[in-house]
């Protein structure tokens, strides 16, 4: 009895509306295409248990950050997040938030929120993640299934691997 599931890599849907919104906010994302939700849903019964959709998250977060600075132009000169804005403007072809968030990497890595400007920016990052993932959790029929996932600590998982389980 071996239990396993397959992972669908590179399976982002790349929502066109988000790409269009990024470009309307000054981005320059070209030739961005994804896999349709219907195709991904058709793969689930074939043993797919994890669908990697990181590109969708990156797009939604980048769009939200661009929108934040468009709606709050005074934040462009913020001591703590102004450099994030400058990177967004300098790297118009990028959509990976890691390219823009380097000035506040302590926040990204450790959750350190030094001021209200960083807190406000992180709020729109969180909303982008929830928008991208929330939609797909519902579409893939996974809503309400989190309690079914067995919780295991890193140490417990390491022990399982040592035992070959």
Language-model segments: residues:
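Catalytic alpha/beta core domains of metabolic enzymes, predominantly
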Residues: 1-60
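C-terminal alpha-helical cap/extension of soluble enzyme domains
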Residues: 39-165
């Amino acid at each position: 009895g071996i239990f396993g599931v397959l992972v669908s890599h590179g399976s982002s849907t790349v929502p066109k509306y988000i790409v269009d919104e990024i470009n309307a906010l000054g981005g320059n994302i070209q030739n961005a295409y994804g896999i349709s939700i219907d195709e991904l849903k058709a793969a689930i019964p074939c043993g797919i248990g994890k669908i990697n959709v990181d590109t969708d998250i990156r797009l939604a977060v980048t769009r939200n950050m661009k929108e934040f600075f468009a709606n709050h132009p005074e934040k462009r000169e913020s001591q703590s997040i102004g450099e994030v804005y400058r990177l967004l403007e300098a790297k118009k072809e990028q959509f990976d938030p890691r390219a823009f968030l380097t000035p506040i990497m302590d926040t990204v890595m450790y959750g350190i929120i030094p001021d209200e400007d960083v807190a406000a920016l992180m709020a729109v990052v969180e909303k982008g993640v929830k928008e991208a993932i929330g939609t797909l959790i519902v579409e893939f029929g996974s809503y309400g299934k989190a309690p079914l996932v067995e919780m295991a600590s890193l140490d417990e998982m390491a022990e399982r691997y040592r035992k070959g389980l």
